[in-house]
């Protein structure tokens, strides 16, 4: 493996780790405190700040994708070498998995106090939702939940393309991570109700895989009408659509130089 690619993979690993350790951490605090130490607003704010901090960690090396859907969209629309897509995605997944383990270790005693040591996925003592997303009971896996994830990720990637386009009105130098964090906060505050706005395959599957091996059993893949695949597939499609929409409406409409 080339040293340059290894450096990029490590940056994506650490950036995603920072994103997930803070993001999952805030959900753990809210759930385990039974909403006495936070609420849905604090979750949205913390996830937005988590994105910002993760981006600052990795931006100078890779641009801080921290999300396989973003990586895929950049390969499709921005000439990111296809050979980097899988290594980046694996690194992002690994960062999310390790971050999930750290949150589990930190809150282990609180989890046991909450559920009595009996790991449950859903229900009053369910704790798997601290790590991965699960849909509301009324939400269909397809098309409802699928559309939810496509729309959320399309908004994410489309706006990211806008705020990083030098021909447009990009975020001021060094402030792009702040703007992206605000964007994620906004998505959570407007489209978080249906299923928790995963909008990132690594953010959902890495923590879900951790809960599978840490005692929550295969129910983490069966719950929510086998919801697990939706936050993997739909964001990848949504990201490509969002990038296409930006380019079709704005990106390809700028006059050619000269």
What are these regions (language model features)?
Residues 1-258:
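Membrane-interface helix-loop junctions and terminal tails of multi-pass membrane proteins
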